[in-house]
A protein has these predicted regions:
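C-terminal helical cap(s) of enzyme catalytic domains, especially alpha/beta-barrels
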Residues: 83-93, 106-136
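Surface-exposed amphipathic alpha-helices with a cationic face
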Residues: 35-39, 60-64, 125, 129
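Generic structural signal for well-ordered, non-membrane alpha-helical segments
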Residues: 23, 27, 53, 77, ...
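Short internal beta-strands
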Residues: 4-5, 99-101
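A C-terminal functional module that forms or caps the active site or interfaces directly
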Residues: 47, 51-97, 103
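Conserved anion-binding
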Residues: 1-45
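Short, small-residue-enriched loops and turns at beta-alpha junctions
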Residues: 9-12, 77-78, 104-106
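Generic structural signal for well-ordered alpha-helices
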Residues: 27, 31, 57, 81, ...
Length: 136
């Protein structure tokens, strides 16, 4: 099951950062509650956390330290792959599934679309590989 936790859109702060009397923010409550639904949360749950959230990955990892995170928003939406890796990776593992759609599919609108998309995908792949190597 993949659940929205903390999205990249500007309006997300209107709701996802809302906190209750115990100062638990909505995105934290979503993660905490969802983990009670699954027999094996680490194998059955993944949480969507937008790449534009940067240091907020620290708070997400506090409530979901080993969970896989689906991370959209790298590239065209302005999310930093370096910040995602720095604050979101699990020590000794990765724990991230990074998605960059617009940065790749809109690399060119010309006849060189396929080549431009391939270049952008390869560039992102190489950046990810470099960050994974550093994390070892």
């Amino acid at each position: 099951m993949i659940l929205l936790a903390l999205t990249s859109n500007r309006g997300s702060r209107d709701f996802q950062y809302f906190s209750d009397k115990q100062q638990t923010r909505l995105f934290e409550e979503v993660i905490n509650t969802a983990q009670t639904w699954a027999e094996n949360p680490l194998e059955q749950l993944m949480f969507v956390v937008g790449a534009t959230q940067g240091e907020m990955f620290i708070d997400v990892r506090r409530v979901a330290p080993k969970s896989f995170l689906l991370v959209p928003g790298v590239g065209a939406q302005g999310g930093s792959l370096e910040s995602v890796a720095k604050y979101g990776m699990i020590e000794g593992e990765c724990g991230l599934l990074v998605n960059s759609s617009r940065g790749i599919i809109y690399a060119s609108s010309g006849e060189d679309f396929a080549e431009a998309a391939e270049r952008e995908a390869a560039k992102l792949r190489d950046q990810m590989s470099e960050l994974l190597e550093k994390a070892k």
